[in-house]
Curated annotation (Swiss-Prot):
Designated name of the protein: Non-structural protein of 4.8 kDa
Pfam families with a match to the protein in the record: Corona_NS4 (PF03905)
InterPro entries (alphabetical): Corona_NS4
Homology family: Belongs to the coronaviruses ns4/ns4.8 protein family.
Organism: Bovine coronavirus (strain LY-138) (BCoV)
Length: 45
């Protein structure tokens, strides 16, 4: 599921695993280490 992630004030659209997307949807402060894409995303509740 494509989702918008704000990094340093800039909006990025990232394709994330359904498990991660569900975690973000449920809410909470999490750190997403996307080794497949080579960068780390942080989502805040």
């Amino acid at each position: 599921m494509p989702m918008a992630t704000t990094i340093d004030g800039t909006d990025y659209t990232n394709i994330m695993p359904s498990t991660v997307s569900t975690t973000v949807y449920l809410g909470g402060s999490i750190g997403i280490d996307t080794s497949t894409t080579g960068f780390t995303c942080f989502s805040w509740y």
